[in-house]
Regions:
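Gram-negative/organellar outer-membrane beta-barrel architecture
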Residues: 1-161, 165-170, 204, 225-232, ...
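Membrane-interface anchoring segments and C-terminal beta-barrel signals
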Residues: 297, 305-306
Length: 333
C-alpha cells in the first residue's frame, strides 16, 4: 500500500512508501517486513525478518538494507549566506546486512546491540562510480570507489515523562572491526540529552547533542552540523562537518488558541569544535564553512491526528532568513 511519509531527514521529500508485512511466514509466528521509501533524490529499501523468542530473552532481527542519498551534509556547497546547501555531485550508496539484538525493556531503559557488514559506494549524479570529488580529493578512506567495514553498534535509550516534565537520553557507540586489509578500524560515539519542563502555561524543551570519532575515517562519516534537525537557519551541513561536534537546541512553546495550536520561539547553536581540518580531504574547510553558528526564530505548531505540523521562520548568524515547513511525530519533536 502506498502511504505518505511523515518522516524528517533524508526522506523529507518522499514521493511514496511501499510496505509489505507477513505476520506468520513459516507458521511459527515469524515476521517479515519489507519497506521501500522513494524520494525525489533518495531511496531506502529494508528487509527485516524477526523470529519469536520469549519476552525475557533478546529479540532477534535479521536486516538487509540499501539506501542511496545525495551526500549534501559533507560534500554539498553552502549558498545564500549558508541558508541552503546544494549537491556537490556526490551520492552515497550504503548496502548492509546484519543482525540486531534488543534486550527486554526495563522501566525506562532499552538497549540494542547490532553487528553488520557494510559496503559504502560513491556515485556521481549520472550513476557512475567515482573515487574523487570535483577537486580531485578521494571520497573514501580506502581510496577506491567504495569502503567495506564490519560495524558493532551498541545503542542505549532512556525515556521518562509525566504531565510536568520529560527526560530522554540516547547513547550510540560504533566500533569498526577490520577483518580484512583496507577495512576500516574506528570508534564513533554520539550522545543526545533532552530535557523538557512545564513552566506555567508554557513548555520549555532543551537538548544537547554531541559526538566524536577516532580511527580510520571516510569523509562521508564526518558529523554534519546545520539543517532542520540540527541548527535551523542553515542548510544541511552548512555550519560545518568534523570529527567532533556539539549542537544545542532550546525551544519555548505556548498554547495560542487551544492545545492543538502552539506558538514557539527557539535558539539553536552548533559547532564542529575545530575538528573540520581533521576530516580527510578537509571538505568543510574547502567549502568555507564557518565551523560554528547560531540560528533563532519563531514558529507555529499544529498538533494534528497524523502528527505535528511545524512552520518555523529562522534567522542565521549571517542574518539570512529561512522559512521551514515540516511534518513529524509529536513524540519526536
Amino acid at each position: 500500500m502506498i502511504l505518505p511519509s511523515l518522516s524528517q531527514g533524508p526522506f523529507s521529500l518522499v514521493i511514496g512508501s511501499l510496505c509489505m508485512k507477513h505476520p506468520n511466514l513459516f507458521g511459527g509466528s515469524e515476521k517479515l517486513d519489507v519497506s521501500w521509501d522513494k524520494g525525489l533524490y533518495d531511496s531506502n529499501f529494508v528487509i527485516a525478518y524477526r523470529r519469536p523468542r520469549p519476552e525475557k530473552l533478546y529479540q532477534q532481527c535479521f536486516l538487509l538494507k540499501h539506501s542511496m542519498i545525495p551526500e549534501i551534509g559533507v560534500h554539498g556547497f553552502p549558498i545564500e549566506n549558508f541558508s541552503r546547501s546544494v549537491s556537490g555531485g556526490v551520492n552515497l550508496s550504503r548496502l548492509s546486512a546484519g543482525v540486531e539484538l534488543k534486550e527486554p525493556s526495563g522501566r525506562h531503559w532499552s538497549n540494542t546491540t547490532s553487528i553488520k557488514l557494510e559496503h559504502v559506494g560513491m556515485y556521481s549524479d549520472d550513476g557512475r562510480c567515482i573515487r574523487t570529488d570535483s577537486d580531485g580529493i578521494p571520497l573514501t578512506c580506502s581510496g577506491e570507489t567504495y569502503d567495506n567495514m564490519v560495524v558493532l553498534k551498541q545503542e542505549s535509550r532512556y525515556a521518562k515523562a509525566n504531565d510536568r516534565s520529560l527526560t530522554r537520553v540516547n547513547v550510540q557507540i560504533e566500533q569498526g572491526v577490520p577483518l580484512l586489509p583496507k577495512w576500516l578500524l574506528f570508534n564513533r560515539f554520539k550522545l543526545r540529552f533532552t530535557k523538557g519542563m512545564k513552566l506555567g502555561p508554557t513548555f520549555y524543551l532543551s537538548s544537547v547533542t554531541c559526538g566524536s570519532m577516532v580511527g580510520d575515517m571516510g569523509p562521508y562519516q564526518a558529523f554534519a552540523v546545520g539543517g532542520l534537525g540540527s541548527v535551523r537557519g542553515y542548510g544541511d551541513g552548512a555550519v560545518g562537518s568534523g570529527r567532533s561536534f556539539l549542537v544545542a537546541n532550546n525551544e519555548l512553546t505556548v498554547p495560542l488558541f487551544s492545545k492543538a495550536v502552539e506558538g514557539a520561539v527557539f535558539v539553536d547553536y552548533g559547532t564542529d569544535l575545530g575538528s573540520g581540518r581533521l576530516v580527510p580531504g578537509n571538505p568543510g574547510v574547502r567549502r568555507r564553512k564557518p565551523g560554528s553558528g547560531f540560528g533563532y526564530g519563531y514558529g507555529v505548531r499544529f498538533n494534528l491526528p497524523l502528527g505535528q505540523l511545524k512552520l518555523d521562520y529562522c534567522t542565521n548568524s549571517f542574518r539570512h532568513r529561512t522559512l521551514y515547513f515540516s511534518l513529524g511525530n509529536i513524540s519526536s519533536s
